[in-house]
Amino acid sequence: MKRFFFLVLIFQNAFSQEIPLNVQKIIKAYPDQIIGYKDNKIIFSDKTTLIYDDFKNKTDQELLDSPDIEDQFKFVYNKADKNLIPKDDPGRIRNEAFFKKIYGNSKSEVESKMTEIIWCPKLVNQKIKVTTVNGIDKIIKKLSAELDNNPEFKKYIIDIGGTFNWRKISGTNRLSMHSFGMTIDINIKNSNYWQWDCNCKNEDATLSYRNQIPLKLVSIFEKYGFIWGGNWKHYDTMHFEFRPELLL
């Protein structure tokens, strides 16, 4: 029996060593859609695959416009910290094909997986549409219930800026994460966005970081698998996006 468990341990260690750490995080974060990894390819539950690493050196703009899946982990996401002045954009690099495989390849396919829930029933009582993929609707209900116990956050979470909206990111040809129903923009009146503050769309513009969102509020979102756009050099402090793989 001891020999059996020893062999199992060896197999598990070999498996872990064969699969890159960040791929292991992806598999753990999206178990219903991703079933494995082989020959530098992510294997999805429908047996289709996507290249994990294209081994190309990319400029900052190329990382945004044509990243592979591995590039999504280029910058480490650090949880909310009062001393944080972001110098990178962790989570802002996204492989569009990957998220289409997870949530839907078109507006109609994404919409077929949507449901309506009540956002913060006690403090806000606002109807919003979110995806049911990976139980995100249930996760947001739990997030919502916790926020409801913090009335000091009401002004930030009322009249939220949006959830589902199949569209391109302003000034780009890249699909917004709002297209997948797994992103929440909270109240824009108490938020900052780099394009508004610099009155530009130039990624190379010199920016002065601004934020009004309490970090305790951010920490609650992070607890439920959401990263914060205020953690980016190109800050978007209203923006919360379900990316549990970056928090593992």
For the regions a language model picked out, list residue spans one by one:
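Boundary at the C-terminal end of the N-terminal hydrophobic targeting segment
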Residues: 14-16
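A cross-kingdom marker for long, charged
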Residues: 223-248
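Sec-dependent N-terminal signal peptides
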Residues: 4-12
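Cell-envelope/glycan interface and biosynthesis
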Residues: 21-232
